[in-house]
């Protein structure tokens, strides 16, 4: 049986108003992506798919292979940020492209709320639905380093979709640090409101970030968005604050 092939793309222009504790970092940014997806379903009901993404710089992005059936789904990828939690967290992305303040304008301990990857090659397993609306997924990577992105690491995600709201809880666990995420997404007609609280137990700091995003679908081809992020680590002079507006 021949595979079905679909090609999709998107582009966004964003005004970022990021403020570090010491500088005004407002700037324009853009995000353009192309996705090519190959899919097939066997006579036995096993489905396979491969997604190949290309970002605006021409680099490989979102390369994921998935096998699914009554047993759930198993996927592998070479993208470290496509693990179980990062692939299904409440990411208040009112805009697709946000520009954080320049590294030189932020303290080394400034926390922006980002979740780490778990290695460029990892596997993810999603259990079949046991209760309507409930999804459980986990990822595992194995490397020789000591951080989540270079060494042994795992992530998991618990999602409950009640229709009127979607709630997500999950963690990224590595040898020396655990990152925690809790988020909720609420659809309101053509609008969607997303709120997330991210934190970790990095030694010597108290990292916590609140991320809020609002999207409104004007039409099938146009979506407006706004995002507001605030990160803290226990020291006011190292706080992070970013607002972005995009279409």
Label each region the model flagged:
Residues 1-247:
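Outer-membrane beta-barrel proteins
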């Amino acid at each position: 049986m021949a595979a079905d092939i679909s090609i999709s793309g998107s582009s966004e222009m964003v005004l970022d108003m990021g403020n570090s504790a010491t500088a005004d970092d407002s700037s324009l940014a853009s995000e353009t992506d192309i996705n090519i997806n190959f899919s097939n379903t066997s006579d036995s009901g096993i489905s396979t798919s491969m997604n190949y993404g290309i970002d605006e710089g021409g680099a490989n992005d979102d390369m994921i292979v998935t096998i699914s059936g009554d047993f759930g789904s198993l996927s592998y990828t070479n993208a470290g940020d496509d693990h179980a939690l990062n692939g299904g967290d409440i990411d208040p992305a009112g805009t697709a492209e946000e520009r954080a303040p320049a590294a030189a304008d932020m303290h080394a301990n400034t926390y922006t709320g980002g979740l780490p990857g778990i290695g460029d090659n990892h596997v993810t397993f999603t259990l079949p639905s046991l209760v309507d609306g409930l999804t459980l997924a986990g990822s595992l990577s194995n490397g020789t380093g000591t951080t989540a992105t270079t060494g042994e690491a795992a992530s998991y995600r618990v999602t409950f979709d009640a229709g009127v709201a979607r709630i997500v809880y999950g963690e990224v666990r590595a040898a020396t640090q655990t990152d925690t995420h809790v988020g909720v997404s609420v659809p309101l007609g053509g609008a969607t409101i997303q709120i997330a609280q991210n934190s970790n137990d990095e030694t010597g700091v108290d990292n916590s970030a609140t991320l809020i995003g609002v999207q409104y679908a004007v039409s099938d081809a146009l979506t407006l968005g706004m995002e507001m992020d605030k990160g803290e680590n226990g020291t006011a002079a190292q706080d992070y604050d970013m607002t972005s507006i995009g279409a």
